[in-house]
Amino acid sequence: STIGQMLPDIVFGCLHQARPDQVPAEGTSSLWNVRLAGGQTFKGVDPEQLKGATRFNVVGFNTGGTGARPGKDGLSVTSFPSGIRNVAVEIMETLSPVVYWKKEYRPDSGGAGEHRGGLGQIMEIANGESAPMIISATFDRIVHAARGTGGGLSGGAGRLSLKSGATLRGFGRQVIPAGDRV
């Protein structure tokens, strides 16, 4: 759950007050589980656009990085405390018409400092059939980025947007229009 993923940052924040040189900084904490669905009717989608579209519903586990550790950089694209890493692009593309146009480390997203936090990632995803699809977002760290400690800067805040330029909400079901990318 999101609470279970975020709780360690609260505990570490308390411990940092007593042992600042022995506690890691905040990390992304929450999982960015990309839930995509297509080929079925959704509010705000013209059923005509769905003719011939493959019906699918997939979930890919994704995450940013952990906070800087005492004496070390944080781990890139690794969640703490679960240790979940990312689902391989090939699995998502095999199970559905989803196409990953980009999946790469997000430069400088870990927060500068003597030891930086682990890097997050940039992903660009589309429906390969050029049909609309839905993203069910449950993404944290968009408004409040992971805070740096010991003089380190905060990490980069998350962002959810369409290639066409529209910004999406971090929570809730939203339409990715036909031909666009998230």
Place the predicted regions along the sequence by residue.
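Glycine/proline-enriched, intrinsically flexible loops and inter-domain linkers
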Residues: S1-V182
